[in-house]
From Swiss-Prot:
Annotated family: Belongs to the glycosyltransferase 28 family. MurG subfamily.
Name of the molecule in the record: UDP-N-acetylglucosamine--N-acetylmuramyl-(pentapeptide) pyrophosphoryl-undecaprenol N-acetylglucosamine transferase
Function: Cell wall formation. Catalyzes the transfer of a GlcNAc subunit on undecaprenyl-pyrophosphoryl-MurNAc-pentapeptide (lipid intermediate I) to form undecaprenyl-pyrophosphoryl-MurNAc-(pentapeptide)GlcNAc (lipid intermediate II).
One annotated Gene Ontology cellular component of this protein: plasma membrane
Known pathway: Cell wall biogenesis; peptidoglycan biosynthesis
Reactions that this protein is recorded to catalyse: Mur2Ac(oyl-L-Ala-gamma-D-Glu-L-Lys-D-Ala-D-Ala)-di-trans,octa-cis-undecaprenyl diphosphate + UDP-N-acetyl-alpha-D-glucosamine = beta-D-GlcNAc-(1->4)-Mur2Ac(oyl-L-Ala-gamma-D-Glu-L-Lys-D-Ala-D-Ala)-di-trans,octa-cis-undecaprenyl diphosphate + UDP + H(+)
The species this protein was found in: Streptococcus uberis (strain ATCC BAA-854 / 0140J)
HAMAP family (UniProt xref): MurG (MF_00033)
Keyword Methyltransferase among UniProt keywords: no
Pfam families per the UniProt record, alphabetical: Glyco_tran_28_C, Glyco_transf_28
Length: 358
């Protein structure tokens, strides 16, 4: 009997990353892999770029809002359409399980899977759940959480952060020779990572303050190909895949938003980092919670976007560098990182138990 698994999740890179870690493991073990998402969403782009033999099923999707908006009336019909489409897909594919990484597009497949008797496994990365995963929790067989859950529920399993990077991930520096030739080896190297939604503020600061490259080598992942540049002490690139971890290793310090995936990658690498979280006006507040947690644990410092400017940036960078031993000690003592292989084995075992009715 062919083993089949459905994945869902999208809207941002963070809702796809873990799926892309797990998919090749299922493929290697002989599973047939399917993905439900929005063909206009980043999940479709990432699956296509991966080259994995995954069957992508597109559905309609609508945003779920906690506040009144006339757009809600339209999106209700989109979600309902997505639910019907998901029911048809699941009936056709007949998967043994659905794994959801969250995002608005995941809600219809999660509900449809439960209605069709397919076990639903959900992953939550943030300290508090978004609306999509709050809904998913009601239909899930198991929910895995990165942080200790604030909700008491027997189906919730705290597993820590699943990341494929580590402090011992290898030396990639020869691949960066062109960039290194432009950098001053006497200067510290800063890496700015804004994520799919938060790079603009970092881009503007670097564009408006060219003197920053007199004090530091600067790497800026911009999300905007028009800003691509390699010049003295400056490398700006819109998007990276294979170079992502090498650039992380090259950096002495990373300035990042508060997305949990990136934060836990930095923790796994024991990389100094300054968090500039998206505020509640640009997110549901999860990045603020993540940043507060990391600062409280002693892993990082945070700086609000309102106070983010060249002077405060340089001040925080100097503080982190001067106190790097204490931050690295806190990160080295963390027990929050779980390897993808360990999580994959746990997930496979849970799927097997559900198949046996346990």
């Amino acid at each position: 009997m062919t083993k089949r698994i459905l994945f869902t999740g999208g809207g941002t890179v963070g809702h796809v990353t873990l799926n892309l870690i797990l998919i090749p493991k299922f493929l290697k073990d002989g599973w047939e892999v399917h993905y439900i998402g929005d063909k206009k969403g980043i999940e479709y782009q990432e699956i296509q770029k991966s080259g994995y033999p995954v069957t992508f099923h597109a559905i309609k999707t609508g945003k779920l809002r906690r506040y009144f908006s006339w757009q809600n009336l339209i999106d209700v019909f989109k979600v309902a359409t997505g639910l019907l489409q998901s029911l048809v897909i699941i009936n056709k594919v007949k998967p043994q399980a659905l794994f959801s990484k969250g995002g608005f597009v995941s809600v219809p497949p999660v509900i449809a899977s439960r209605l069709m008797g397919v076990p639903v496994f959900v992953h939550e990365s943030d300290l508090s759940m978004g609306l999509a995963n709050k809904i998913a929790l009601k239909f899930a067989s198991t929910m895995y959480t990165t942080f200790e859950s604030q909700v008491t529920n027997p189906i919730i399993k705290h597993i820590g952060a699943v990341t494929k990077v580590s402090k011992e991930s290898g030396n990639y520096l020869p691949e960066l020779s062109d960039i290194q030739n432009k950098f001053n080896p006497q200067l510290k190297t800063l890496l700015f990572i804004g994520g799919s939604a938060g790079a603009k503020v970092f881009n503007q600061l670097i564009t408006n303050n060219p003197d920053l490259t007199k004090a530091f080598n600067v790497i800026n992942i911009t999300g905007d190909s028009q800003l691509n540049e390699l010049s003295q002490n400056l490398y700006r690139v819109d998007y990276v895949t294979d170079l992502y971890q090498p650039l992380m290793q090259l950096a002495d310090l990373v300035i990042t938003r508060g997305g949990s995936n990136t934060l836990f990658e930095l923790l796994a690498m024991q990389k100094l980092h300054l968090i500039v979280p998206l505020g509640k006006e640009a997110s549901r507040g999860d990045q603020l919670e993540n940043a507060n947690y990391f600062e409280k644990q002693g892993y990082a410092r945070q700086l609000s976007e309102e106070l983010f400017n060249p002077e405060t940036l340089i001040s925080e960078v100097h503080y982190l560098l001067e106190h790097q031993d204490q931050f690295r000690k806190a990160m080295s003592e963390s027990q929050e990182i779980k390897s993808p292989d360990v999580f994959y084995d746990l997930l496979k075992n849970d799927i097997s138990l559900k198949a046996k009715g346990k």
